[in-house]
Amino acid sequence: MVERAGWCRKKSPGFVEYGLMVLLLLLLGAIVTLGVFYSIGKQLPLLTSLLHFSWDERTVVKRALRDSSLKSDICTTPSCVIAAARILENMDQSRNPCENFYQYACGGWLRHHVIPETNSRYSVFDILRDELEVILKGVLEDSTSQHRPAVEKAKTLYRSCMNQSVIEKRDSEPLLSVLKMVGGWPVAMDKWNETMGLKWELERQLAVLNSQFNRRVLIDLFIWNDDQNSSRHVIYIDQPTLGMPSREYYFQEDNNHKVRKAYLEFMTSVATMLRKDQNLSKESAMVREEMAEVLELETHLANATVPQEKRHDVTALYHRMDLMELQERFGLKGFNWTLFIQNVLSSVEVELFPDEEVVVYGIPYLENLEDIIDSYSARTMQNYLVWRLVLDRIGSLSQRFKEARVDYRKALYGTTVEEVRWRECVSYVNSNMESAVGSLYIKRAFSKDSKSTVRELIEKIRSVFVDNLDELNWMDEESKKKAQEKAMNIREQIGYPDYILEDNNKHLDEEYSSLTFYEDLYFENGLQNLKNNAQRSLKKLREKVDQNLWIIGAAVVNAFYSPNRNQIVFPAGILQPPFFSKDQPQSLNFGGIGMVIGHEITHGFDDNGRNFDKNGNMLDWWSNFSARHFQQQSQCMIYQYGNFSWELADNQNVNGFSTLGENIADNGGVRQAYKAYLRWLADGGKDQRLPGLNLTYAQLFFINYAQVWCGSYRPEFAVQSIKTDVHSPLKYRVLGSLQNLPGFSEAFHCPRGSPMHPMKRCRIW
């Protein structure tokens, strides 16, 4: 490694020096053994001194680190050699880790990886997803054996998606058929006002889009666990999503103008193409005028919505009321709420109770919606509602419709090329048939032994979280006890649900029993999926909550926490290097999947998760003292991350409010994982070093943690993500969390006042 000014770390010995040390050891025996002890002490000075262990425990940890490294040797297995090569290639050892650890850990990765033309962002996560999709392609295209019905349906759906010649031949025909089903698209037909417009009702239109096409437009009605009683389901009413990814794009700031213009051109082009396909006159001026009205309407809707950073407190969002109160408070110029909701539920043969209650999340939006509805004609409303359905279905049509959105996607994401077809199809099938596809992935690529190993890691990190509560002087004993109870009650799901591999278990086939796919009807297959997903959700209203239900599929590179279930989920897709391998050193496992485990556990105690108790019910279990001080501790982190200015996103600052929950989880996760690793060593765990890397165990832990987040963005997507992503940009996830961790600056000998060892640190958990 190259020495850098201000890098106050002793240079580690190279291979030649190690060879000499071995010879000297044979000759000098005990004398050099003392020297080795001294050398190791110099490499890892006071590694645990600021982790608030007791003095006795601190001594045990340091002794364990010494003994472990003395007894271990360099790992030369294929897995270790691959890990060493990956780490070395990703690093930029010319950079000072105390100045910018992200560049030190990821500089090589950034230098070696160019963002593909199809991607708006490219990262370690994206590469893992790409590799997973290659596996899924193989199993979905494998025709050598017959599978159970659910799996065969997934393969048929995949083949229909790949059947591009038929998709091109059918062109806009399937979409035009759907437009008739939803009452027509006024801008793309003649005489709508005199025909379909005469019997138009907003309530019925919204209900059809919701129940038949899973499009919750204008009003977001959905079924989910009741926040106040997690054992039952309830109807929720909330503000909707919009056609563009963020409400900010609808406003007239200079940097949004290009996106708005491209969006309007996209809308206009699609409507014009559909008119031509029906042999209607082009009517360019009329089409542009009506699509401009649609954009104006959607802009007013965007203005009526509440920014996401102001919606973090679920206790402030939650308002329970019966249908009569809903109607009285939000009449919306005669909008019949009972008719709307009943029409949605009738699709699954569910009847509203006379005293049915709903939970309204979007009160400010509904208060603003009345004036908007009153300002626009039925024609403009229908143009907007159907546009949102058309927008969703563009990807299922022929190539010329995809080409119509090229400029819009370029303005929004910076991409100029569509994803290669097989990847698009693999992703689509996995998203819609996650259990069936997951069963294929598990059989092909997942080691079942990983489940027990990860479960042990969860227990180690959960134990550290509980012990860390004693270090918090901002939290009183009453609240600490409740926090401990909640942490101990967190349930985990690892890898996959067992039933997807059980041939005698009919649940997997029953999950897709209502679906019948055809290889030459990809568009209609997609409509079946939309309807099935919508109705499967709506049916839950009268069903008891299944606490063992998986909220995500197995073939997914991610992890999750559900506050309503107090449950953490680690799909099989993330249980792979660099996150996890039973064949790589434990420093990498703790810095990888260990950090992820700590991250998800901490989500149970972030600015949203803290509002739910050990059973997943929204309940205030905090004392006034602890709640007040939690807010104060949070302000430190909001300020810290809010001061990160991202040059790639036009020098916009990270939104410390909207990213708070993820920042809390990142900070807690890496802190818990590191302490759990030290404790594992102290308890006799024997780790191994990697060949070719003069790095201590602690340094390997932090480098693997950082390299999980290596990645780069296109400028357009950087601008979008800073508006919409609840996560901080990748490099600030690393820098922010490690700046706050004393163990990091100790491991790399960063002087106080250096960028990675700031004078003030933030800590919540």
UniProtKB/Swiss-Prot annotation:
Enzyme Commission code: 3.4.24.11
Positions of glycan attachment: N163, N279, N303, N336, N694
GO BP terms, alphabetized: proteolysis
Cofactor(s) of this protein: Zn(2+)
Gene3D superfamilies for the chain: Collagenase (Catalytic Domain), Neutral endopeptidase , domain2
Coiled coil region boundaries: 523-549
Record-marked site positions (Cleavage): K62, R63
Keywords from the named record: Coiled coil, Disulfide bond, Glycoprotein, Hydrolase, Membrane, Metal-binding, Metalloprotease, Protease, Secreted, Signal-anchor, Transmembrane, Transmembrane helix, Zinc
Active site: E600, D666 (proton donor)
Membrane topology note: Single-pass type II membrane protein
Protein name: Membrane metallo-endopeptidase-like 1
Naturally occurring in which organism (per UniProt): Mus musculus
Gene expressing this chain: Mmel1
